[in-house]
Amino acid sequence: VPLHKENDYTVKELVDSAFIQSANASMVALAEKVAGSESKFLELMKKQLKDWGIKDATIVNASGLNNSYLGENRPENTGETDENQLSAKDVAIVARYLILDYPEVLKITSTTNQTFGENTQSPVEMVNWNWMLPGFVNYHEGVDGLKTGTTDFAGACFVGTINKDGRRIITVVLNADNHEENPSARFNETSRLMDYCYDNWSEKELGKANASIPSLKDIKVKDGKETSVNVALKSPVKVWVENGMDTGKLTITPTLDKKKVTDDQVTAPINKGTTVGSATIQLADDKLGYLEANQEPSTDIITTSTVEKANIFVIGWRHVTDFFSNLF
């Protein structure tokens, strides 16, 4: 998609062209609009990746092209043949945050064709490079994104996403084999991945509301009529489970809220249903884990009863007995 200096383009037009037809010039224009220069935009990119826990990515330009194509226009302090490098895991993390934080992007990535610069003297008809969308040769029902990418170094790549029966998955295919002879290779592999996930995995609930936690039955209560209060899970969690996996064997890991629980105790009065922490719930047999630790499914830990504050005489007597017990 060419940019003409005599034309004005909106930010939306540039964003649309970048997603729909991999418009490299549009990406550079957006970088300059956001940060003042492409080099400054790279610093924002690196900071964002770091905030997402991605620490080993190589970022040298905004477009994703090899620097050899950019010539003198490559960002300063980057090599003549440098290229962005991210692992499949890194790409999946970026895609996940993009969809979670900006779900409206799927309206763009699911667009099959659109006119760029429609109100200018040089409009261009764009056609989406994602052949898994409706009307294309590799159409797969439910696919609504996300982005293709191709360089000599990275090969033919595709980050796909599909929503089926309310369950969304993200797939990453890098350097698809036999792409030169079969341009559909990356989409064929993506289709296989998607079918495998839905055929072999399903979403299920783990844990139960008000279920006890094996490693944390109760919490001490300071100055209460009772000296402890039982705690439990507030609700079950939904997780993807591989078919045939034992959902009865769970690993529940509690974490108490330090603002409410001091020295492993809460202070009376405390009401039933008060949140005192959170607990992650995992299948004991699940060895795959998650892309990020903060993705582990969790639920609140709540108190199962109300504990009123004890009267002043009871509190005073407890302090006296505690004092003498500490002496011996």
Where are these regions (language model features)?
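A mature extracytoplasmic/lumenal domain signature
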Residues: 5-7, 32-34, 63, 173-175, ...
